[in-house]
Amino acid sequence: MSDTVTDGDASRRRHGRVVVVYGGRSAEREVSLLSGGAVLASLVRSGVDAHGFDFAGGGLSGLEALAPDRVFIAMHGRDGEDGSLQGALELLGIPYTGSGVLASALGMDKERTKQLWRAHGLPTPESVMLEGEPDWDAVIEALGLPLIVKPVHEGSTIGISIVETRDALIAAHAEASRFDSAIMAERFVQGEEYTVSLLGDEVLPAIRVEVPSGFYDYEAKYHSDTTRYLLPCGLEQEEERMLGDVCRRAFEAIGGRGWGRVDVMRDAQGRFWLLEVNTVPGMTDHSLVPQAAAHAGLDFDALVLRILDTTTGS
């Protein structure tokens, strides 16, 4: 019998039995299935004892029955990204990828994230919660037009609208209310959109996102072939360093760990404005973290293993 130890053998010993959790019942289920499938295939290629689990099909008891040594969380949105799954895994004593309970809950709440950023002196556009019967004229006076209406607890730009009139604001509020009971309006920042990925202690290269329609919505993120991702992003070296630093500080402000992504706008005066943080970013063929990692010299399989190595308790 050969004593040769292959990379796959070493990976199985190091990581144990890994369950990739994806799917779920949130509005981001479709994207999560794609992310989870890509991660699972990658782990199998790397020789990891990996198994996929659609959380909608068995819940926590089904996951526990698989007896994972670690969980790779690829379930976006509610339950998977908001601290719920993280808390359950901590109660079960199962290590998992990504941020902990509090950071996940904060990252999923756009308004509380912005409150924390403001408390840390970090730049983020002004916003107003649209509660009860909003005073539409007061909202417009506070934020100006155009402005953005967002569900507070959704990702992937689901339910988000850019509005230019009072009537459009009312309609956008109704649309966002289909996805969440908590709705916010935010000052619209005209300019260039950037995203910065974080992996462990490393800040990956920034990506500039260009969309012909001017709005990086769900269709542009996951289905459009006309969305452009610019790497290098076109910023001067010092500007990109400053952008990376503000994104790192934004991630740390909510207590983020492991990996994540921060979305930013740059206005006509060259100022950066933090939009939101993603604690379970997409891992599809259109996703931004894999693109940034590739530009930094990490292929997809290496990236997935790096994320797995940041597992809590490892």
Curated annotation (Swiss-Prot):
Cofactor note: Binds 2 magnesium or manganese ions per subunit.
HAMAP family on file: Dala_Dala_lig
Gene3D superfamilies to which the protein is assigned, alphabetical: 3.40.50.20, ATP-grasp fold, A domain (3.30.1490.20), ATP-grasp fold, B domain (3.30.470.20)
EC number: 6.3.2.4
All copies of domain ATP-grasp, residue ranges: 114-309
Family assignment from sequence similarity: Belongs to the D-alanine--D-alanine ligase family.
UniProt KW keywords: ATP-binding, Cell shape, Cell wall biogenesis/degradation, Cytoplasm, Ligase, Magnesium, Manganese, Metal-binding, Nucleotide-binding, Peptidoglycan synthesis
Subcellular location: Cytoplasm
Catalytic activity field: 2 D-alanine + ATP = D-alanyl-D-alanine + ADP + phosphate + H(+)
Binding site for Mg(2+) 2: E276, N278
Organism (species): Chromohalobacter salexigens (strain ATCC BAA-138 / DSM 3043 / CIP 106854 / NCIMB 13768 / 1H11)
Keyword Repressor on entry: no
Pathway this chain belongs to: Cell wall biogenesis; peptidoglycan biosynthesis
Name assigned to this protein: D-alanine--D-alanine ligase
